[in-house]
Amino acid sequence: MEVLSVKDLKFSYYLNETDTFHALQNITFSVEQGEMVLFCGLCGCGKTTLLKLLKEEIRPDGKMEGEIENRYGSMQTGYLFQNPEQQIVCRTVEEELVFGAENMDMPRDEMARSAAELAAYLGIEKMLHESTQSLSGGQKQILNLASLLMMKPRILLLDEPVSQLDPVCTWEFMNLLKKVREDFGLTILVAEHNLDLFLPEADKVIYMENGRINYQGKKDLFIRKMFQEEKKFVESLPETVKLYHEAGGTEEWPFAAATLIKALNQEQRKVLFPEDLELEESLGGQEVILIRGGYFRYEKNGRDILRDLDLSLYSGRIYGLIGGNGAGKSTLLSVLLGYRRFYRGKYQANPGMALLPQNPAYAFLKDTLMDDCRMIASVERIEELLNEDVFFSDVRQWLSKNPLDLSGGQMQKAAVFKILLKDPDILLLDEPVKALDGYEKEVFLQLLKRMKEKGKMILVVSHDLEFLQRVADECLFLYDGKISAQEACGRMFVNNRFYTTVKGKIKGMLQDESFITN
């Protein structure tokens, strides 16, 4: 049964009183009851714009043409935002859970019964009376999903729902999503760069390019088409699929590490997964950040967010910082930059430090990107950086735009451009690739490596472990307020079970003789 139909949809944003930007052109597709449809494409292709147009209350301001027919209407269509913070409005979890239902005038006895039943079903009873601000990012996103389910939706629209979640929270969220889809027969439309998670679950893939649909259909044909035609987007495909293709595979694409191993012969395994790990030799360089016995808390009588922290970071290296949501990673960056201070311990840092905030919107103050950049750099310096690296090749066309009007990936690139105008020697990056497609990640990776060669020290906080394995010299694991592990990324990911990569997981399996025997 068809539950959603879009015919010849066109949409343009108003840039000013006379100019418009054509974001979507001739969009036509339909969705069947219970389907999961994955929308994907390079940054700025129009995924989020399309998703928002399907939910009447949050449609962006602009000119829309064409037809959108929703069998269930907007009231039974829930929208989950990328940023967990963006959707929460109440003080406690219990208040947030019923907030939407209250606004729909659900009878109080029905609302109380539904809240109790849903909390038990999702396993969130223990956090009902907690403050929403005390929750981790993963808990907030699960609460957002629960709040939507309270309103008994038939269709869910998800905009990069796990991009800001750590691996464990992502696993929990995906399991819950599968559960509610199967139990309630929900129809799910998701816009996502992380195809590793959603492509295996998708019934249909819609690939967008420059505001148009370039492909819609089954995922097997989609993967084959990407390898044949869309070279840029290949970087966004699941790691297992790329490795299988590298080994010569062309069909029956594996989405799990164990499935990939079984599909490869012994010689292919040796080529793709050599036994040698990265050597942890000294890379030299000058110590640019030193912490000994650092303690930090937000309130005088509160708990320590960082405690007995020791850390030494050196020039000419790239470090990855990982850990769970709420572990204190962003707090540590704010202390390093001087926004906050340890109340006990020793801290020394060289000058010339810059921070890319987790929310790139915080990097901008003016109405145009050019005005923002002119606050800290000359026109000559702006022009120099525009021509310096291919990562910034499309930034020039955004200079006259309000940076807050850019897509998530475009805003991320614009924020990186702005902070690099000062040519910092120490660069702190908080989730820098969360809104970038695979191709943009690869170009950004090469930019960071060139900066490393110039002697820069770069600390990258990210939940994208595949990216960290390729870019970082060492990974630091922040747990319980201190660095619990620090070693070469390849070695760490082989030893880890949850905070790991596809290659790390497979190398760990290949070291397990019982697994290979079976």
Give each language-model segment a name:
Residues 192-193, 462-463:
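H-loop/switch region of ABC-family ATPase nucleotide-binding domains
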